[in-house]
Amino acid sequence: MLGLGYIGRKLFGTPNDRKVKRTRPLVAKINALEPAFEKLSDAEIVAKTRELQARAQAGESLDALLVEAFANCREAARRALGLRAFDTQLMGGIFLHQGNIAEMKTGEGKTLVATFPAYLNALAGKGVHIVTVNDYLARRDSEWMGKVYRHLGLTCGVVYPFQPDDEKRAAYGADITYATNNELGFDYLRDNMKSSVAEMYQRDHFFAIVDEVDSILIDEARTPLIISGPSQDRSDMYRTLDAYIPFLTEEHYKLDEKQRNATFTEEGNEFLEQKLQADGLLPEGQSLYDPESTTIVHHIGQALRAHKLFFKDQNYVVTDDEIVLIDEFTGRMMKGRRLSDGLHQAIEAKERVTIQPENVTLASVTFQNYFRLYEKLAGMTGTAVTEAEEFGDIYKLGVVEVPTNRPVARKDEHDRVYRTAKEKYAAVIEAIKTAHEKGQPTLVGTTSIEKSEMLSEMLKAEGLPHNVLNARQHEQEAQIVADAGRLGAITIATNMAGRGTDIQLGGNVEMKVQEEIAANPEAAPEEIRARIEAEHAAEKQKVIEAGGLFVLATERHESRRIDNQLRGRSGRQGDPGRSLFFLSLEDDLMRIFGSDRLEGVLSKLGMKEGEAIIHPWVNKSLERAQAKVEGRNFDWRKQLLKFDDVMNDQRKAVFGQRREIMETDEISEIVADMRQQVIDDLIDDFAPPKSYVDQWDIEGMRAAFIDHAGVDLPLADWAAEEGVDQDVLRERVTAALDAVMAQKTEAFGAETMRVIEKQILLQTIDAKWREHLVTLEHLRSVVGFRGYAQRDPLSEYKTESFQLFESMLDSLRYEVTKRLGQIRPMSDEERAEMLRQQAAALAAAEGAADPAEAPAPQPAAQVALAAAPGFVESDPTTWGEPSRNDPCPCGSGEKFKHCHGRLA
């Protein structure tokens, strides 16, 4: 009997069907304009862009311009690339412009789709960011689609790591900018560590289109981007504690593989206490439970996790004396990414490579909070529907399935479940051999480098030629993927998410043409292309007859979405194909999430060795397990976001205030307000309201103003006068400190004083924010234990982090007032002595034979900072944070960025 839901869908259609239906009239209007736009000259296409820009900037809505803009963009793409967008691609572009996630299957041309909403929104003049998962794709897409934008009269830039500053600023200043999610996030953090607006890279966050949006906004959501600096070196401690792990037995610890956590049992704690005390690392009578043991407990716990939960060639690789993490979702190496809390150092100790010092966080942001900065956000992926709830809850993004241009002809078969991994891999080899013999290309999906290389050895033993694509071979990635659809090809790959290159049946024509032209520069390119296209057509037909691409997965992933991405590599643009998952009860997902019931069923069925169970019930059971894991991960991310939102509000407040300070010339007013609050606080502390004069702590107040403002005030004389109360005292102190600052301003000059105030203010904000981040990290690590006392950890975190934030602001006011109180102009004698020392240092550096030139006179702002207590010219740690364009504090006369700043 048919359910009511099924009948309702047949009668009224699904919500997705209705969304698609609403775009059809717009697509029809765009198609109706096509003949007129085909007649335009190239110059007229650019003129159309200028007209649309003028209308957008005059206030006409982008929705009103959509039809003409899409028609213009389609014609430009046809001329620049020889590609005419399908109606389904126009639909995808419309959904993106409306701020949705467009789910488009592999091979449907997502790269071209993004040009339509990017062009339309760029007309507003605020810049559009197109976000990719790696630098290769950012460069490739900007170069490829840049031809379309230039044909339309717009500029296109690409952002990449270690790019020169001027080039990066120009890329962000372009109408459309391609960049990776990592680089965008790091540049946002770097911008908020700059000392002037002119040095910043990014404009306002207007509109971003995120490719592989599920990978970036869900898989990477829990990963914070952190800019950090080194802390003290503890490498000896990591090595020492690592040596204890091999002595542990299973009774000494408990593992939680679901949450990647490890804890010591009572037996384990007793064993470690005895060993550590015997070796002198733990004093006699001191327990691991004592507060003094916190550091040892933390680091030996991380050593346990490193050995028991993180595995070489699965979670990381060892290369060039370094531990490089592997992205569990894409199989790519993540160079430069490090685990926090000493875990990375514990893995380095385990693998006997050089241990890098732990880092202190200077600035951080999560992708969840970075991408929520944009006025409008959209995304593209082949698999989003399973995560629609999360996209809606966290990012307020709807998910729309865009129809394929041609119906999907891939056959998705039921999973085959074997009892043991040995039986499973034997069946996998047989299936690969059968497909290879009939010429069907096979893509074999594995979950780790270790398993991909084990399977490779098994295929070698059978004499089957194949390619392996994992984190070790990522340089040959494009070539391996391009060949994966050729007749009889066998390709073993770790997770294929975000690979960015389509597997085309018969091979990639364009790549083959470019290779041949490069190898035979004297041959006619047209002849090479014609020959290769003919060869490709013949090979493609044979592959189609063999059944198209066979996707063979050797394990299910925790996420259904990753499995669907792998399936989606087959059956692109209506091609035939087949997908099949081979599983065993020893697989991680089955083992961790309960294969006991299935084991019982298999036993009752009396299965023999090598036999598999194939039934829709098995698929449903596994998908339920995956849905449970996805739900748990979603809950984690949601909870983490609630905590991060607390810090995010504070981050936005600090970064916003910092930006205002960089943009304003009225610094003295901000500084005066801070000084006044310090005065009010100190007077309230030492001369409380409604107290008598003889109750005031005059000497304490005098010492406090000397310490915090650098001024010795005649407070005792003022207090002895008739009629002096707290208000009178406040007025006199304020007038005295204002007068001192006025004298300094006159001595330095108003412009120089403004520079000094701005530098001190920005440096102090940065230093205090860094300290605050460390404090919040510590609070975050311990607040979870409040749950044992029946208190809500999130509520406690909100309350205490707000108190810490207020305390940081108080400390900021005191520090700025104190540093400004300490600066003074140099006397002529001091200045002459400083110049003499600089000249001597230069002479020593350049050699006695070369007479040293007298160094260039330093700006007063630098002289003032040099005069501050604690400043040592030869010690960069006492220089504070000079602006990159300031003269270097070492006295070389060079700009900081060309001297010591270049080494930083």
From Swiss-Prot:
The keyword Oxidoreductase does not apply. May bind 1 zinc ion per subunit. GO terms for cellular component: cell envelope Sec protein transport complex; cytosol; plasma membrane. InterPro entries: Helicase_ATP-bd (IPR014001), Helicase_C-like (IPR001650), P-loop_NTPase (IPR027417), SEC_C_motif (IPR004027), SecA (IPR000185), SecA_CS (IPR020937), SecA_DEAD (IPR011115), SecA_motor_DEAD (IPR014018). CDD domains: DEXDc_SecA, SF2_C_secA. GO terms for biological process: intracellular protein transmembrane transport; protein import; protein targeting; protein transport by the Sec complex. It is a peripheral membrane protein. It catalyses: ATP + H2O + cellular proteinSide 1 = ADP + phosphate + cellular proteinSide 2. ATP binds at residues 89, 107-111, 502. Its EC number is 7.4.2.8. Pfam families: P-loop_SecA (PF21090), SEC-C (PF02810), SecA_DEAD (PF07517), SecA_PP_bind (PF01043), SecA_SW (PF07516). Its cofactor is Zn(2+). Coiled coil: none annotated. Its main location: membrane. Keywords: ATP-binding, Cell inner membrane, Cell membrane, Cytoplasm, Membrane, Metal-binding, Nucleotide-binding, Protein transport, Translocase, Translocation, Transport, Zinc. Belongs to the SecA family. This is Protein translocase subunit SecA. The lineage of its organism: Bacteria, Pseudomonadati, Pseudomonadota, Alphaproteobacteria, Rhodobacterales. The gene is secA.
